[in-house]
Amino acid sequence: MGLLWYLMSLSFYGILQSHASERCDDWGLDTMRQIQVFEDEPARIKCPLFEHFLKYNYSTAHSSGLTLIWYWTRQDRDLEEPINFRLPENRISKEKDVLWFRPTLLNDTGNYTCMLRNTTYCSKVAFPLEVVQKDSCFNSAMRFPVHKMYIEHGIHKITCPNVDGYFPSSVKPSVTWYKGCTEIVDFHNVLPEGMNLSFFIPLVSNNGNYTCVVTYPENGRLFHLTRTVTVKVVGSPKDALPPQIYSPNDRVVYEKEPGEELVIPCKVYFSFIMDSHNEVWWTIDGKKPDDVTVDITINESVSYSSTEDETRTQILSIKKVTPEDLRRNYVCHARNTKGEAEQAAKVKQKVIPPRYTVELACGFGATVFLVVVLIVVYHVYWLEMVLFYRAHFGTDETILDGKEYDIYVSYARNVEEEEFVLLTLRGVLENEFGYKLCIFDRDSLPGGIVTDETLSFIQKSRRLLVVLSPNYVLQGTQALLELKAGLENMASRGNINVILVQYKAVKDMKVKELKRAKTVLTVIKWKGEKSKYPQGRFWKQLQVAMPVKKSPRWSSNDKQGLSYSSLKNV
């Protein structure tokens, strides 16, 4: 056997050498016809000469005295070798113009050449064969054919491809279909039907790789053919539209100064149309970019939706734009089989504002900022500002008004409120601020009529200071008499103002006079330790409500009242 193969090889090389000097039509390596097959599966390959390069078929050529010769070049080799047709079990054989592998092996990968010749004529072509190793899930480097079907558009079928000629029509092979790694059994809208796979109303979820495994017997052996088809669900024809230009549009103006970079995107949406050639291009003043003297760069990008609707973007850019460039007409064009569309970009030169406008804007901005600052300052320090104005520019209310007291203090007669009035309020208002207080229990004479003396004291006072607490609202108390008298005096004569100081919160407001007073008068809240500091907010609010006095009744040397440190101990 070895001697016979050696003699055949010598004969083959002799034939090649004898025709090396003869003219032979060499069609080269037909890379468009690269054949991929799985390892350990049969393969049948027809000589491409009779399919693409010659006008006659094998029978005509054979009857004319032409001989078909096969040889190959191993992968990563340059030496042409004859094909060994004497392998065990006829693993490689030739039948007319077909080369058979039953089955293929990985080392069968290489370039195969079929040559048709006689003594006066020679023609040959080569094609690559790649044997691919199969994994457990049909994934490999093999390129799969793509079958497109319209979304929600009737019933579609795919057929197991490239199985014709492997077995006679009398043989009924078994066929198993898979999606990815999963055998197709009881799928929602996919039904295997032998060599066919039917899709009922295709959906995007049907996208994927579908594999058919065909098993057939031959000469006592079982062979398997594995074929994979990529299914892609695409947009329906009823949704097909002419191009839709998203950008440029009438809402966007590209305003640039000379020397700046001008960038204009032309963004176009194409609905899916089978075999449609989608185009996008720019014109500048009616000319293509290559026909104008402007230094223009155009970059294109394409993206696809799940149903292969296409968004194509062409970005036109000019690095340093000139005034002349800003006067040009830039138009985006688009076309598909449904029609054409175009949209001009709005480009203009930016107007630089005059200098005085900038200065005016800056001045206005500064004014607004100053006003805002003043409003904030007033909001934070309004009490201090009012007290400052009263101290320096206010009119003294105590001159010739016939009043004896600055403040009449009304409060509930119990230990806690009395301590707050006699120690805290009196200590600060009289000793620190110089006001004269009228406190009934301190200033009334023994034996007098309470009602008459109360009304008399209130009429002699400029302010009625009401210390609110839960005990204050009890019916029948002297405190309520003082409140009613003060409110009536304020309403009828207007010669006394009422000041409400909330010493403790009053939840149930049953006294209608007090309820009405709280709705129209400001309530100054005592907050315990936080309010004891004489320069704090509580005392400033109280001072604002007090009568304006130009100078205290006592000099600072006569003040022997409470200091802040003494208030802390109250």
Swiss-Prot record:
GO terms for biological process: cytokine-mediated signaling pathway; inflammatory response; innate immune response; interleukin-1-mediated signaling pathway; interleukin-33-mediated signaling pathway; positive regulation of interleukin-13 production; positive regulation of interleukin-4 production; positive regulation of interleukin-5 production. The active site is at residue 482. SMART domains: IG, TIR. Keywords: Cell membrane, Disulfide bond, Glycoprotein, Hydrolase, Immunity, Immunoglobulin domain, Inflammatory response, Innate immunity, Membrane, NAD, Receptor, Repeat, Secreted, Signal, Transmembrane, Transmembrane helix. Residues 21-367 are extracellular. Glycans are attached at residues 57, 107, 111, 118, 196, 209, 299. One of its GO terms (cellular component) is glutamatergic synapse. GO terms for molecular function: coreceptor activity; interleukin-1 receptor activity; interleukin-33 receptor activity; NAD+ nucleosidase activity, cyclic ADP-ribose generating; protein tyrosine kinase binding. It comes from the Eukaryota. The chain crosses the membrane at residues 368-388. SUPFAM superfamilies: Immunoglobulin (SSF48726), Toll/Interleukin receptor TIR domain (SSF52200). The keyword Ribonucleoprotein does not apply. Detected in lung, brain, spleen, thymus and liver. Expressed in brain endothelial cells, astrocytes, microglia and neurons. Isoform 3 is predominantly expressed in brain; expressed in hippocampal neurons. It catalyses: NAD(+) + H2O = ADP-D-ribose + nicotinamide + H(+). Residues 21-128, 139-230, 243-348 form the Ig-like C2-type domain. Residues 1-20 form the signal peptide. The keyword Nucleus does not apply. Residues 553-570 have a biased composition (Polar residues). Residues 403-546 form the TIR domain. Residues 69-85 are annotated as: Essential for interaction with PTPRD. Residues 550-570 are annotated as: Disordered. Its EC number is 3.2.2.6. Disulfide bonds join 24-122, 47-114, 137-181, 160-212, 266-332. Belongs to the interleukin-1 receptor family. The interleukin-36 receptor complex is a heterodimer of IL1RL2 and IL1RAP; the association is inhibited by IL36RN. The interleukin-1 receptor complex is a heterodimer of IL1R1 and IL1RAP. Associates with IL1R2 to form a non-signaling interleukin-1 receptor complex. Interacts with IL-33-bound IL1RL1 to form the minimal interleukin-33 signaling complex with a 1:1:1 stoichiometry. Interacts with KIT (independently of stimulation with KITLG/SCF). A mast cell-specific KITLG/SCF-induced interleukin-33 signaling complex contains IL1RL1, IL1RAP, KIT and MYD88. This is Interleukin-1 receptor accessory protein. The gene is Il1rap.
